Amino acid sequence: MSDVELVLRSTRVITPEGTRPAAVAVAAGKITAVLPHDAEVPAGARLEDLGDDVLLPGLVDTHVHVNDPGRTHWEGFWTATRAAAAGGITTLVDMPLNSLPPTTTVGNLRTKRDVAADKAHIDVGFWGGALPDNVKDLRPLHDAGVFGFKAFLSPSGVDEFPELDQERLARSMAEIAGFGGLLIVHAEDPHHLAAAPQRGGPRYTDFLASRPRDAEDTAIANLLAQAKRLNARVHVLHLSSSDALPLIAGAKAEGVRVTVETCPHYLTLTAEEVPDGASEFKCCPPIREAANQDLLWQALADGTIDCVVTDHSPSTADLKTDDFATAWGGISGLQLSLPAIWTEARRRGHSLEDVVRWMSARTARLVGLAQKGAIEAGRDADFAVLAPDETFTVDPAALQHRNRVTAYAGKTLSGVVKSTWLRGERIMADGEFTEPKGRLLSREP
C-alpha cells in the first residue's frame, strides 16, 4: 500500500457487493483496494473524507450526440463533456450523426478524434454509423476502435445519415455479426410513421399521434427476427413504447442477443404534462403517457430493459419552434440525468444501487469497458460524489451544455453532484472545472 496516493472515505460507498462504509485507495489512476472505513491512511497519501455523501462509480453514458465537428453551434466536446462532468458522468460514447462529417469511415473517425483530443473533460469513445452504402467501411471502423454501429430504420432528420431498409439492414447486420460487432438501432418503422396522421402545429397530442407505438413495435419485431436469424448482437436504442416489452422479453428468453436502453425523459416526464407548443419536450420516439411510463419502470426492475442513457441531442434554441412537426427533436440531459432518475427511482422504491447498475455497470458492460462501471480493485478511479437528499430547482442558466434549453426547467430534483473524479483526479467540484483531462477511448479487443 506504500504507493497509494489518494484515499476517498465515505460512510456510503456503492460497490458491486452493496453499499457500505469504506475507504477507497487510489494509485496511478486506478483503484487499488476497497478498505474498511476506519483503515489507516498510508503514509504520503491524501485523504478526502466525504462524510455521508455517497461515493459511486462514475456514470457511463453510451448515447450522446456531441455534434462536433460541423454543428458546434448545437454542441461540442468542450461543452458536452463539462455538462457530463457536472452530472457525475465520467465516460460518454458519441453518436456518429449530427456531426459533419458523420462517423461512417475511418477518415471521418480520425477527423472527429482530432477535434475531440484537447477538449474532453471526461473520457470519450465513438460509435460508427451503418449507412446504405458503407458496408465496406464497417470492418475497418471496427478495427479502428469504434464500439459498434448505429443504424436508423426511419429518416434520421439529417440528410447525411440515411436510414436502412430491411434488405440493407440484413446486409449490414450480417457484416457486423461476421466480425463480432454490435449493431445499435433507432427502431421506428417508416411505413407506420407514413401512415400516421401528420397534422403539425403546437398540440402535443397531435405530435404523439404522429409517432405511434406500433411504429416502434413493428421495427423492433423485425429487428429481433433478423438478429435471431443471423445470431447477431443488437441493441435497441431509446425504447419508448411499453407495448414492445413482451416481444423483447420473449426474444431474450429464446436466446436472442439483444439489449435495450431507455432514457431519463421517458422515465421522468409524461405526455400529460407537456404544454402545447413546448418543443423542448420533443424527441423521437416521443415521451408517452404515464401508464406507459409505469411499465417501463417495471421492465427496468425485471431486467427486460438493461440500462438508462441520456440520448443527449441538443440544438440551437431557434430550432425549438412551437410547431412539433418542424421543431428539432432532441432533449439535452447530460447534466441532469442522475438527479432526474434518482428523484423518480427513489419515489418508486428503488435504491441508488439500482441507479448505478442501470447507468454505470450495465452501460460499461454494453460497450466492453472492463475498466469502468464499478468501485473495485483494478478499475479506473472514476467517481461521482452525490448528496442524495439535497434538492435543487433546475435553472437553465446553471447548465453547462451549449444551448441551455431543457425540459426540466423549474423542476425540483433530488441528488446534488458535489464532485466528479476521473482516474483519481477531481475534475469538477461544486460547479468548478479543471482543464480537460479526458482520454479518447477505443473498443477493447
From Swiss-Prot:
Gene Ontology annotations of biological process type: allantoin catabolic process; purine nucleobase catabolic process
Gene3D superfamilies linked: Metal-dependent hydrolases
Gene Ontology molecular function terms on file: allantoinase activity; cobalt ion binding; zinc ion binding
InterPro entries: Allantoinase, Allantoinase_bact, Amidohydro-rel, DHOase/Allantoinase_Hydrolase, Metal-dep_hydrolase_composite, Metal_Hydrolase
Coiled-coil segments: none
Residue sites binding Zn(2+) 2 per the record: K150, H186, H238
Quaternary state and interactors: Homotetramer.
HAMAP family attached to this UniProt entry: Hydantoinase
Functional note: Catalyzes the conversion of allantoin (5-ureidohydantoin) to allantoic acid by hydrolytic cleavage of the five-member hydantoin ring.
Protein name, entry field: Allantoinase
Originating organism: Streptomyces avermitilis (strain ATCC 31267 / DSM 46492 / JCM 5070 / NBRC 14893 / NCIMB 12804 / NRRL 8165 / MA-4680)
